[in-house]
């Protein structure tokens, strides 16, 4: 007990932290030495060698000697090395193991049971140096255990017994790693153990780097296979600098990306069509599985890691680490039953083709993910997750060592292409890195990054390797991310039981041959990305440049995969673009895929376009192969029924879309402009209404737009395509003169004539009257003339060139058809319309000279047997149409109404249909299901500061709308994991300058009334000193004030003392003399010291006369000549004021021989005025109006902005404005 107490004193209590400084370490060392000395006599009495528990030199690691015990804790043996060598029977494999040892002042009893970390069909494959594959059946399957510590319900243990104990031990308060004691570490501490004992080192994560220094390889022991003492000193020496350099820096799980590297795409990650393909049967939801979820894991160790540990030891080491990972995923804080099962281990003695591994974690992971996606096991069986373990010191953003430990795609689990991680080997702590990176694959984000969990809580998903008192667990945020992932179909691969993968079949093609550069760009930048085709991109074998949006290409500075085509008959090999050569692939000619389904019609009426398309990807042309012959699209007209007469022209609709978009800073109303060259008919030209300019708003109109009015031809992909009268694309079928498609004019009767009459100029003259129903109308002058053709109705309404106003050439719609008016300087005028017209028209000529002759012709349908040809009578029927649902969820309605159709395709007025047959319609209920719950944020609170950065908060509420009800609050768990921001910064602008007051000085008097002062500075928001002129708008605080520290004690030596009399005011005759009463004290030398009168205010003044008459001598009776005249002054009068500066006056007379005289010299006259009481008057006390207060915390800013006169601000900020005044 004495030893245990000493040991407890040597180690700080939980949570107290390590000893600070060298002195602290020294105290611990001394205490430990003392402990060992005290315990020497009782060590033999402890069954499990308790002295080993005190053999460490600090609180991060101790030496222990485990012993095997039975379930009751009774000693069995010190020999714990046989457990991994004996082949166990099935019965033994199911039995439990017990070990016991002392550490950190307590007895630990481990109760262990076999772990299910390995699949029943687990195999090890070795890829040899010549590319050969070797399959091994490991003999270590029965030495991996998991369990707990007796008397600690929250503990967990995951260890390997293959060569001593190696693994993870987690207690309620701490987390330890255990492994056999390295010989060098024992030698350094001059530690030895009795024969047959097998000492181990139990250490915290903080000591991991130090422990690894003393190993030939991580996980090796003192006398175990693979241990080579001759190699250890060299290894220790070579890693000494590395340890000290990396001990503080190597703390990040996922590294930090340099600022110039691009951010990941914001859109959804690109997924190939077979990314989550099932194996033939539908998969259940992982989130609803009643059994545990199995992560069938492939582990790959690279060449550096195999060399580092040795081929004979690396398997045991890796499986020990994976057993620890399994234990971490079984921790109760994860909230789900996750079983990590290793189905296969691949050891790389050299890198296979297409797999590049170096310091650059991002590039290495990209290469590994591509490589492992092509691995296929027995019967096409695939693993769920692939883990790459590397001996490289990796870095997330450069091909040099740095502080990265692992790298992984977010939410990649179960994906064929993204369920993969890279992890740097750091010893047994590697288990935490693997658990962290696999957590990312499960969709987990770092704690504290976009979620409410704190970064430094000691959780597995913290950004850095810092535990909470050494304990790592899963945070509530990680649980939520995992729960969300398991509820998606993507997680379906985890539901099935582990199956035999067998030996993997390695791909016979390089990754770049399987996935071209466009696909690699999609993986990196999203579904819209493709290989950049800009000229500056030179070598994709060094950096793959991709194009996503706009005229900008971007890169993640990762090379294209091995085997990617980089030029004509060239491909990427080892970062170089080289010619195919003899080993290069043979040309593959492209073949078309199957035709797609028909697309939606581009128009709902008036003749739209739909298409089918196919792709030249079955296979794609590669390595100089030919592209597929023929077209990738076929088009067909659709919805050719005419639109309503009142509907807007299709081209006009497209122009109108730009009405709400600013054009060069202004908004216009746009109309179609069609007076363009023939080759520009399929561009969208629009004219600004009421302005004389037009503009090409788009390089091509929408598919199905007519090339020209009243023509069948339509625009498709910016090209005018021929359409026959039979409404077939590419058809040359035309209508005859009477409008019969593919007709021969046999149903037409033609009329024609010539008008040659001459008339007087500047008058309209009729040429021909053409009846309604006419077709193929053509009016043309025979020669060029100065006259003009005109058209009017029978009611004198002019459609063309009326009122002596000449119209420009162009198209003029009237009378049910469109007339094309042609006029040029070298060709005769011409009018043409296909018809039919719906009214009788009068064609005239506005005569301007000689009439050269006007030819006219038109056609009318023939009359059969006295009646025109029978026309089909239109049929009018009711049809039901319905709108879209009014809402997407929460219960809405579909409006249903009946419309009248002519011939089942044209909507007409309802009066054409029979009211008796009109169907009854009523709204339909739709989308009557609850909407997804969402976060409804409240209003932001008032900012906590008026300037210099404050905070404001708001409440959020999880609400949900149920069918036909108002939104109501629901449980927060129903809303998305990510919540809207609840706290935000506000009023970040700098505060205006303010007066800054220093502390008051000491009072100038220790008793009685004194004065104290303080310093005043003008300071800005950053506490910098500014000129006082910038603070003049603010009230200037007082710099001096009176102070009284206490009343002075009475001085018994003070007394009123009368001064000596003054001289008599007259030199002869009657005069006056005065004396003063002064507050005085007689000093030690007998001299009087005068004080202010207030010091004697408590002493009664003696009742003495202070003024009396005097008479030096009598004035002579007769004038005495030759006596000099002098000035005589009377006493000063009382001051006019008591403070602030007043005036005193007195009388001065010139006297000679006792009589007034004028003989005195004026420049000698004494002053008759003088200043008095010049001291400052005390400021009057202001009586503040109790109703004059500030209602807002920003009121002090109102005087600074000079708005106190404003009615609102002056009233609401009365106090601040009063101070300003």
UniProtKB/Swiss-Prot annotation:
Residues 293-498 form the Peptidase M12B domain. GO terms for cellular component: extracellular matrix; extracellular region. The precursor is cleaved by a furin endopeptidase. Glycosylated. Can be O-fucosylated by POFUT2 on a serine or a threonine residue found within the consensus sequence C1-X(2)-(S/T)-C2-G of the TSP type-1 repeat domains where C1 and C2 are the first and second cysteine residue of the repeat, respectively. Fucosylated repeats can then be further glycosylated by the addition of a beta-1,3-glucose residue by the glucosyltransferase, B3GALTL. Fucosylation mediates the efficient secretion of ADAMTS family members. A motif (Cysteine switch) lies at residues 252-259. Residues 48-284 form a propeptide. Expressed in fetal lung, liver, and kidney and in adult brain, prostate, submaxillary gland, and endothelium. Glycans are attached at residues 151, 190, 313, 745, 838, 909. Keywords: Cleavage on pair of basic residues, Disease variant, Disulfide bond, Extracellular matrix, Glycoprotein, Hydrolase, Metal-binding, Metalloprotease, Protease, Repeat, Secreted, Signal, Zinc, Zymogen. Residues 750-876 are annotated as: Spacer. Binds 1 zinc ion per subunit. Pfam families: ADAMTS_CR_2 (PF17771), ADAMTS_CR_3 (PF19236), ADAMTS_spacer1 (PF05986), Pep_M12B_propep (PF01562), PLAC (PF08686), Reprolysin (PF01421), TSP1_ADAMTS (PF19030), TSP_1 (PF00090). It is found in: Secreted, Extracellular space, Extracellular matrix. Residues 498-577 form the Disintegrin domain. GO terms for biological process: extracellular matrix organization; eye development; negative regulation of platelet aggregation; proteolysis. Disulfide bonds join 369-420, 395-402, 414-493, 453-477, 521-546, 532-553, 541-572, 566-577, 601-638, 605-643, 616-628. SUPFAM superfamilies: Metalloproteases ('zincins'), catalytic domain, TSP-1 type 1 repeat. One of its GO terms (molecular function) is metal ion binding. InterPro entries: ADAMTS/ADAMTS-like, ADAMTS_ADAMTS-like, ADAMTS_CR_2, ADAMTS_CR_3, ADAMTS_spacer1, MetalloPept_cat_dom_sf, Peptidase_M12B, Peptidase_M12B_N. Its main location: secreted. The active site is at residue 437. Its EC number is 3.4.24.-. Residues 589-644, 931-990, 991-1049, 1052-1116, 1123-1178 form the TSP type-1 domain. Residues 1-47 form the signal peptide. PANTHER family: A DISINTEGRIN AND METALLOPROTEINASE WITH THROMBOSPONDIN MOTIFS 18, ADAMTS A DISINTEGRIN AND METALLOPROTEASE WITH THROMBOSPONDIN MOTIFS PROTEASE. It is linked to Microcornea, myopic chorioretinal atrophy, and telecanthus: A ocular syndrome characterized by microcornea and myopic chorioretinal atrophy. Microcornea is defined by a corneal diameter inferior to 10 mm in both meridians in an otherwise normal eye. In addition to ocular findings, some patients have telecanthus and posteriorly rotated ears. This is A disintegrin and metalloproteinase with thrombospondin motifs 18. It comes from Homo sapiens. The lineage of its organism: Eukaryota, Metazoa, Chordata, Craniata, Vertebrata.
């Amino acid at each position: 007990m004495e030893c245990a107490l000493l040991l407890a004193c040597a180690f700080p209590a939980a949570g107290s932290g390590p000893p600070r400084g060298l002195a602290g370490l020294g105290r611990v060392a001394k205490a430990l030495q003392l402990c060992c000395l005290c315990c020497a006599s009782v060590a033999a009495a402890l069954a499990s060698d308790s002295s080993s528990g005190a053999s460490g030199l600090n609180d991060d690691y101790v030496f222990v000697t485990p012993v095997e015990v039975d379930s009751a804790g009774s000693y069995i043996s010190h020999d714990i090395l046989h457990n991994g060598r004996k082949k166990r029977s099935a019965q033994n494999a199911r039995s439990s193991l017990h070990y016991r040892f002392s550490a950190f002042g307590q007895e630990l009893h481990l109760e262990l049971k076999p772990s299910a970390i390995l699949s029943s069909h687990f195999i090890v494959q070795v890829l040899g140096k010549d590319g050969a594959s070797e399959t091994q059946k490991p003999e270590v399957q029965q030495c991996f255990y998991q369990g707990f510590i007796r008397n600690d319900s929250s503990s967990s243990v995951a260890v390997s017994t293959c060569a001593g104990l190696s693994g993870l031990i987690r207690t309620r308060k701490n987390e330890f790693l255990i492994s056999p004691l390295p010989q060098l570490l024992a030698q350094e501490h001059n530690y030895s153990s009795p024969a047959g004992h097998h000492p181990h080192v139990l250490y915290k994560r903080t000591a991991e780097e130090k422990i690894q220094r003393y190993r030939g390889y991580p996980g090796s022991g003192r006398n175990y296979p693979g241990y080579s003492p001759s190699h250890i000193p060299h290894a220790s020496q070579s890693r000494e600098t590395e340890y000290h350099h990396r001990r503080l820096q190597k703390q990040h799980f996922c590294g930090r990306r340099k600022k110039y590297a691009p951010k990941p795409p914001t859109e959804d990650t690109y997924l190939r069509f077979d990314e989550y393909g099932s194996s033939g049967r539908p998969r259940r939801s992982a989130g609803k599985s009643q059994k545990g979820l199995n992560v069938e894991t492939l582990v790959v160790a690279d060449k550096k890691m195999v060399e580092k540990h040795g081929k004979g030891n690396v398997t045991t080491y890796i499986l020990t680490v994976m057993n620890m990972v399994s234990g971490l995923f079984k921790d109760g804080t994860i909230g789900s039953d996750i079983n990590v099962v290793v189905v296969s281990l691949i050891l790389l003695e050299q890198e296979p083709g297409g797999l590049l591994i170096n310091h650059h974690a991002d590039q290495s992971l990209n290469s590994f993910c591509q490589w492992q996606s092509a691995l296929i096991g027995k019967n096409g069986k695939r693993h769920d997750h692939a883990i790459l373990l590397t001996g490289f010191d990796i870095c997330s953003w450069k091909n040099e060592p740095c502080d990265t430990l692992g790298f992984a795609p977010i939410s990649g689990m179960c994906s064929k292409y993204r369920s993969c991680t890279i992890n740097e080997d750091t010893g047994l702590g590697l288990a935490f890195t693997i658990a962290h990176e696999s957590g990312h694959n499960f969709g987990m984000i770092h704690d504290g990054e976009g979620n409410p969990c704190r970064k430094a809580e000691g959780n597995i998903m913290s950004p850095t390797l810092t535990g909470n008192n050494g304990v790592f667990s899963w945070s509530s945020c990680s649980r939520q991310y995992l729960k969300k992932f398991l509820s998606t179909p993507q997680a379906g691969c985890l539901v099935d039981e582990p199956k035999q993968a067998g030996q993997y079949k390695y791909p016979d093609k390089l990754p770049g041959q399987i996935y071209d550069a466009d696909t690699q760009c999609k993986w990196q930048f999203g579904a819209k990305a493709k290989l950049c085709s800009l000229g500056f991109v030179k070598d994709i074998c060094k950096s793959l440049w991709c194009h996503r949006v706009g005229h900008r290409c971007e890169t993640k500075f990762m090379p294209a995969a091995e085997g990617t085509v980089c030029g004509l008959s060239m491909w990427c090999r080892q970062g170089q673009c080289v010619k195919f050569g003899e080993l290069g692939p043979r040309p593959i000619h492209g073949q078309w895929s199957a035709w797609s389904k028909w697309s939606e019609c581009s128009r709902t009426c008036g003749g739209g376009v739909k298409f089918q398309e196919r792709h030249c990807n079955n296979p794609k042309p590669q390595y100089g192969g030919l592209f597929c012959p023929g077209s990738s699209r076929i088009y067909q007209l659709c919805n050719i029924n005419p639109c309503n007469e009142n509907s807007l022209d299709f081209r006009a609709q497209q122009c109108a879309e730009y009405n709400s978009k600013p054009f060069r800073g202004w908004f216009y109303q746009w109309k179609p402009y069609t007076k363009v060259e023939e080759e520009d008919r399929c561009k969208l030209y629009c004219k600004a209404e009421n302005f004389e300019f037009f503009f090409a708003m788009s390089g091509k109109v929408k598919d199905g737009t007519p090339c020209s009015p009243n023509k069948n031809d339509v625009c498709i992909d910016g090209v005018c395509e021929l359409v026959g009268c039979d409404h077939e694309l590419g058809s040359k079928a035309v209508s005859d003169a009477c409008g019969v498609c593919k007709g021969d004019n046999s149903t037409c009767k033609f009329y024609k004539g010539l008008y040659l009459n001459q008339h007087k100029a500047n008058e309209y003259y009729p040429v021909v009257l053409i009846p309604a129903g006419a077709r193929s109308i053509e009016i043309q002058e025979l020669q060029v003339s100065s006259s003009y053709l005109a058209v009017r109705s029978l009611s004198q309404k002019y459609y063309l060139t009326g009122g002596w106003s000449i119209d420009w050439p162009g198209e003029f719609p009237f009378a049910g058809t469109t007339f094309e008016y042609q006029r040029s300087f070298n060709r005769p005028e011409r009018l043409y319309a296909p018809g039919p017209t719906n009214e009788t028209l009068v064609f005239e000529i506005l005569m301007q000279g000689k009439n050269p002759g006007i030819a006219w012709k038109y056609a009318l349908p023939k009359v059969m047997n006295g009646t025109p040809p029978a026309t089909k009578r239109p049929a009018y029927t009711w049809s039901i149409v319905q709108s879209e649902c009014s809402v997407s969820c929460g219960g809405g309605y579909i409006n249903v109404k009946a419309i009248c159709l002519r011939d089942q395709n044209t909507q007409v007025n309802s009066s054409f249909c029979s009211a008796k047959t009109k169907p009854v319609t009523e709204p339909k209920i739709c989308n009557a299901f609850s909407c997804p719950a969402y976060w409804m944020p409240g209003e932001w609170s008032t900012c906590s500061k008026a300037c210099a950065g404050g905070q404001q908060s708001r409440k959020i509420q999880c609400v949900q709308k149920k069918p036909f009800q108002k939104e109501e609050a629901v449980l927060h768990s129903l809303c998305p994991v990510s919540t809207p921001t609840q706290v935000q910064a506000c009023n970040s602008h700098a505060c205006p300058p303010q007066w800054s007051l220093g502390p008051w000085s000491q009072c100038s008097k220790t008793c009685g009334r004194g004065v104290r002062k303080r310093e005043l500075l003008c300071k800005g928001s950053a506490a910098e000193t500014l000129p006082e002129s910038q603070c003049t708008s603010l009230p200037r605080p007082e710099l001096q004030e009176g102070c009284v520290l206490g009343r002075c004690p009475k001085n018994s030596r003070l007394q009123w003392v009368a001064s000596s009399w003054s001289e008599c005011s007259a030199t002869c005759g009657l005069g006056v003399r005065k004396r003063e009463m002064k507050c005085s004290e007689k000093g030690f030398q007998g001299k009087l010291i005068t004080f202010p009168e207030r010091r004697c205010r408590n002493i009664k003044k003696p009742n003495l006369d202070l003024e009396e008459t005097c008479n030096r001598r009598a004035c002579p009776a007769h004038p005495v000549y030759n006596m000099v005249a002098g000035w005589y002054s009377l006493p000063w009068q009382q001051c006019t004021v008591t403070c602030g500066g007043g005036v005193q006056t007195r009388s001065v007379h010139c006297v000679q021989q006792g009589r007034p005289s004028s003989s005195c010299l004026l420049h000698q006259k004494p002053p008759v005025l003088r200043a008095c009481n010049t001291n400052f008057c005390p400021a009057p006390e202001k009586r503040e109006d109790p109703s004059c207060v500030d209602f807002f915390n920003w009121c002090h800013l109102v005087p600074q902005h000079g708005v106190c006169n404003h009615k609102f601000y002056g009233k609401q900020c009365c106090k601040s404005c009063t101070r300003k005044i």
